[in-house]
């Protein structure tokens, strides 16, 4: 197995020792990725998380200037920034604006790729809304996830959620869906 590894950095002390002795020129290339904002949670948990498109674009520029080669993008509902969105037009807009300012920054849109189940158990459409925006990378979540997610109250001046909400998340991707995506 080790013959197939580009580098084995499971032992952190080995990694630090190699870096200390040889410097960066002896290390394998790395891609620094910055996840701009969370998929479900936002400024209610960390005021530094950008939610609006303008703020995310600026954060992408700042990350690029700090050395990031890739940004991971989630979009928010412009009428309620406390809610995630799967609007393909929002992904297209943010990608276009980031590319205008940082043409060689790799854009990684979240895609999930699977389906969510409604309260009646019926599966929805494939979650691939970000793909028409033509990101260089799209994150696909290969898993089955049945969980509860706590959406925290958004304190003033944030709007969109006046109290904590517990929501159920039922997500699944099967072999056929993964092959289609």
Predicted regions and their residues:
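Acidic (Asp/Glu)-rich catalytic clusters
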Residues: 23-28, 64-65, 99-102, 126-136, ...
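N-terminal small/glycine-rich loop or linker at the start of catalytic domains
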Residues: 22-48, 142, 146, 154-167
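Alpha-helix-loop-beta-strand connector modules within alpha/beta enzyme cores
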Residues: 34, 82-109
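Hydrophobic faces of well-ordered beta-strands that scaffold small-molecule active sites
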Residues: 32-36, 71-73, 105-111, 136-140
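Active-site mouth loops of central-metabolism enzymes
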Residues: 36-58, 111-121, 170-172
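Glycine-rich, proline-tolerant flexible connector loops at the mouths of alpha/beta enzymes
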Residues: 44, 69-91
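Conserved anion-binding
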Residues: 116, 128-181
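Conserved, mostly hydrophobic/aromatic
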Residues: 56, 63, 74, 138
């Amino acid at each position: 197995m080790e013959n197939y590894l580009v580098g084995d950095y499971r032992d952190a002390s080995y990694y630090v020792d190699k870096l200390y002795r040889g410097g960066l020129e002896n290390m394998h290339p790395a891609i620094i990725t910055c996840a701009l904002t969370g998929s479900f949670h936002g400024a209610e948990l960390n005021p530094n998380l950008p939610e609006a498109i303008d703020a995310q674009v600026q954060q992408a520029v700042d990350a690029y200037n700090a050395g990031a080669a890739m940004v991971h993008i989630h979009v928010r509902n412009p009428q309620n920034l406390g809610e995630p969105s799967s609007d393909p037009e929002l992904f297209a807009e943010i990608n276009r604006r980031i590319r205008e300012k940082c043409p060689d920054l790799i854009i990684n849109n979240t895609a999930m790729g699977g389906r969510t189940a409604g309260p009646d158990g019926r599966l929805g459409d494939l979650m691939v809304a970000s793909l028409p925006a033509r990101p260089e990378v799209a994150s696909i979540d290969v898993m089955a996830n049945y969980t509860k997610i706590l959406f925290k109250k958004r304190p003033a001046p944030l709007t969109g959620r006046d109290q904590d909400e517990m929501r159920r998340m039922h997500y699944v991707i099967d072999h056929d869906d993964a092959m289609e995506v």
